[in-house]
């Protein structure tokens, strides 16, 4: 069985093929591995990473400040006393110490 196409039907088939090809490329531009959706997802992850970096840098500055206060050349007595109480559990004879347990961390 031989099918013959006239010029009009060939144009229609070509247009359908080109339309399907266009739909394919548009779909992959939006939903593909390097498409718009993937780009937005990576941007959200990047923003979260920058926020975490900002928080970690602030924490680092605070820790560096605390270390500086505990160095012998600039020893801060209040900081030393606070760390002794916190880490070693030391308290002055006239002080009362109350320990509050975090219930959420025990689960």
From Swiss-Prot:
The protein's predominant localisation is membrane
Q: Which residues cross the membrane?
A: 12-32
* Location relative to the cell: Membrane
UniProt cross-references to InterPro entries, sorted A to Z: FtsL/DivIC
Q: State the source organism's domain of life.
A: Bacteria
Any one annotated GO CC term:
membrane
Keyword list (alphabetical) reads: Membrane, Transmembrane, Transmembrane helix
**One Pfam family it belongs to:** DivIC
Q: How does it sit in the membrane?
A: Single-pass membrane protein
What name appears for this protein in its UniProt entry?
Uncharacterized protein RP423
In which organism is this protein found?
Answer: Rickettsia prowazekii (strain Madrid E)
């Amino acid at each position: 069985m031989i099918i013959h196409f006239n010029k009009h039907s060939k144009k229609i088939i070509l247009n359908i093929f080109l339309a399907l090809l266009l739909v394919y490329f548009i779909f992959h531009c939006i939903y593909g591995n390097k498409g718009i959706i993937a780009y937005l997802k990576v941007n959200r992850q990047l923003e979260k990473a920058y926020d975490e970096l900002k928080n970690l840098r602030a924490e680092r500055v605070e820790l560096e400040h605390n270390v500086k206060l505990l160095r012998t050349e600039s020893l801060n007595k209040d900081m030393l006393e606070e760390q002794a109480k916190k880490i070693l559990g030391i308290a002055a004879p006239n002080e009362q110490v109350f320990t509050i347990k975090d219930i959420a961390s025990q689960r």
